[in-house]
Amino acid sequence: MSKVCILTGKRPTYGNNVSHANNRTRKRFEPNLHTKRIWVEEEKRWVKVRVSAKAMKIMSKTGTAELAKLIR
């Protein structure tokens, strides 16, 4: 399963670990993803989605209507 948020499209980014001696090694920054069961009123069913913390905040503000459009 890929580490991509279904709502915001966030995916891993890459950067460097930098030590005190300024040695650099490549690092992968993972998005803060959570698997959630969400009740979609329009569909009258539970949907299991993998969303980021930012997407959960968006859903709490706007509701699940935006999510229902993506599922169809």
Curated annotation (Swiss-Prot):
The keyword Ribosomal protein applies. InterPro entries: Ribosomal_bL28 (IPR026569), Ribosomal_bL28/bL31-like_sf (IPR034704), Ribosomal_bL28_bact-type (IPR001383), Ribosomal_bL28_sf (IPR037147). Gene3D superfamilies: Ribosomal protein L28/L24. One of its GO terms (cellular component) is ribonucleoprotein complex. Pfam families: Ribosomal_L28. The keyword Cell membrane does not apply. One of its GO terms (biological process) is translation. One of its GO terms (molecular function) is structural constituent of ribosome. Keywords: Ribonucleoprotein, Ribosomal protein. Belongs to the bacterial ribosomal protein bL28 family. This is Large ribosomal subunit protein bL28. The lineage of its organism: Bacteria, Pseudomonadati, Chlorobiota, Chlorobiia, Chlorobiales. The gene is rpmB.
